[in-house]
């Protein structure tokens, strides 16, 4: 999936860039309104690093999905967290934890083989979001 995201214009941040983004996105623990709705390259500039102007989204690979991790919060901007899961059940658990902490008004999306009905049903029953 990482290869496909890169192909589609994602920019994967290194450790230093992730920390700069954390500090820029949530100074003093609150969402920085200046990043809302801005393109990825402008947010990167605000954080003190450069990305190509055609970068569509900034992605931080993180493992902490608690609310202590700024990437786990809603950012209202083209900045995403990417989590690695052991298996499908672990991925659903991570998603549930994020939605539970962030609020049910959000959207959840599952990309899977349409023949995997048990996965689709588990995802739909577990994640209580406004839009599935």
Regions found by a protein language model. Give the residues of each.
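Conserved C-terminal structural/oligomerization subdomain of aldehyde/semialdehyde dehydrogenase
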Residues: 49-132
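ALDH superfamily catalytic-core signature
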Residues: 1-66, 91-93
